[in-house]
A protein has these predicted regions:
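Rossmann-fold cofactor-recognition segment
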Residues: 48-64
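Conserved NAD(P)H cofactor-binding loop of Rossmann-fold oxidoreductase domains
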Residues: 87-93
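C-terminal helical subdomain
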Residues: 173, 180, 196-234
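Substrate-binding pocket helix/loop in short-chain dehydrogenase/reductase
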Residues: 95-96, 103-105
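Conserved glycine-rich cofactor-binding loop
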Residues: 9-11
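Conserved glycine-rich Rossmann-like NAD(P)H-binding loop of the short-chain dehydrogenase/reductase
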Residues: 25-41
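Catalytic loop of short-chain dehydrogenase/reductase
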Residues: 133-159, 164-165, 169-173
């Protein structure tokens, strides 16, 4: 499988990459904004599996030119993408009364528009049977518990959830499945920012493994689904 994952340099994205390279049967392109963190990812991955086919590229899904990414894909993947994992995301924890319009713009750009740009650029390279997996949040899941300070973040994730349902229908003829995992808490830097002092019962590597496994197999059973993945609240 040829797999691309965004937001790959930390948290559950980092752990999903590690899970995907262990078998040696997949080619993985890891995208993130931090070159230093990507180099650390490469070092750890090759330490675990010296023969892994992992290619890292410093890339901003919101602001960078996708022509460069497409050239990178052509050189490493021969213009074929089997799985796209849209994991990149940021979080602002701030009371609603203090939120600026720029805060909402930042959340929507990174957590929604960036994924729109990635899908538009890459779906032409995805054959029938491919899988787009969006990483959402329980914060944006309808009917879930909501928390003060996360209005902008939760709204941006809710937009990604709805996009998932829409694109599953639009890509029916092409044969590309689209699903979304609405993640609950996992012990990451982002969780610590949102809920200081809270200890999640789920470790980042456990959630990363779940994401990797679902990316590989979930499209056999689901399409257009927003699946809650939460063992606790948050």
């Amino acid at each position: 499988m040829n797999i691309i994952i965004t937001g790959a340099s930390s948290g559950v994205g980092f752990e999903a990459v590690i899970e995907l390279i262990l078998s040696g049967s997949h080619k993985v392109i890891a995208l993130a904004r931090s070159q230093d963190k990507l180099e650390r990812l490469l070092e750890i991955a090759h330490g675990l599996n010296p023969d892994c086919q992992l290619f890292a590229l410093k890339f901003d899904i919101v602001h960078d030119d996708y022509e460069g990414l497409q050239q990178f894909i052509a050189s490493h993947f021969d213009n074929r993408v089997d799985i796209l994992i849209n994991n990149a995301g940021v979080l602002i924890n701030k009371p609603f009364a203090e939120l600026l319009e720029s805060d909402f713009v930042e959340m929507l750009q990174t957590n929604f528009i960036g994924h729109v740009r990635a899908i538009q650029a890459l779906v032409p390279l995805m054959p029938s049977g491919s899988h787009i997996l969006n990483i959402g949040s329980m914060g944006g899941f309808q009917g879930s518990a909501k928390f003060p300070g996360l209005a902008a973040y939760s709204a941006s994730k809710s937009a990604l959830h709805t996009l998932t349902e829409c694109l599953a229908q639009e890509f029916t003829e092409q044969g590309v499945k689209v699903n979304c995992l609405a993640l609950g808490s996992a012990q990451t830097e982002m969780l610590e920012q949102a809920f200081p002092g809270y200890q999640s019962p789920v470790m980042a590597f456990e959630m990363g493994k779940y994401i990797a496994d679902f990316a590989l197999t979930g499209s056999k059973f689901f399409n257009g689904k927003i699946i809650p993945v939460a063992a606790s609240t948050p």
